[in-house]
Amino acid sequence: MDKREIFVKMASIEERIGDLYKEIGELKDVIVVLMEENAQLLVENQHLRNRLDRKKTGSQAKQKGTSPVAKEKAKKAVVGEGYDNLARLYAEGFHICNVHFGSLRKEGDCLFCLSFLSGGPQK
């Protein structure tokens, strides 16, 4: 092989590597979109389950005649559970702040999310 052939092959390899790099970037973007959609669906699924549980609990409470104190404790338990779910989502790498809610955290910790988490569940 002469120098020209080697140079042409290197240029060809460089071009293929560039194309592969572009394709990897596109696949990465698709994965980010799918992960965000998955997180949104997980949150929606959890909300629907909570709603179903409340509906079941409400119909059982009507039958049993639950006291107001028990109803207040149930409300506080739901709030604590929601906070735990948001903390779990943040730990999995998603924003829980009102600025970027549900999107994937790409650059480490988010101050808005951390300020929300540091406030803890409101009593």
Curated annotation (Swiss-Prot):
It is found in: Cytoplasm, Nucleoid. The keyword Glycosyltransferase does not apply. Its main location: cytoplasm. Residues 52-72 are annotated as: Disordered. Zn(2+) binds at H95, C97, C110, C113. Keywords: Cytoplasm, DNA replication, DNA replication inhibitor, Metal-binding, Zinc. Its cofactor is Zn(2+). One of its GO terms (cellular component) is nucleoid. GO terms for biological process: DNA replication. Binds 1 zinc ion per subunit. Homotetramer. Interacts with both DnaA and DnaN, acting as a bridge between these two proteins. Belongs to the YabA family. HAMAP family: YabA (MF_01159). Involved in control of chromosome replication initiation. Inhibits the cooperative binding of DnaA to the oriC region, thus negatively regulating initiation of chromosome replication. Inhibits the ability of DnaA-ATP to form a helix on DNA; does not disassemble preformed DnaA-DNA helices. Decreases the residence time of DnaA on the chromosome at its binding sites (oriC, replication forks and promoter-binding sites). Tethers DnaA to the replication machinery via the DNA polymerase beta sliding clamp subunit (dnaN). This is Replication initiation control protein YabA. The lineage of its organism: Bacteria, Bacillati, Bacillota, Bacilli, Bacillales. The gene is yabA.
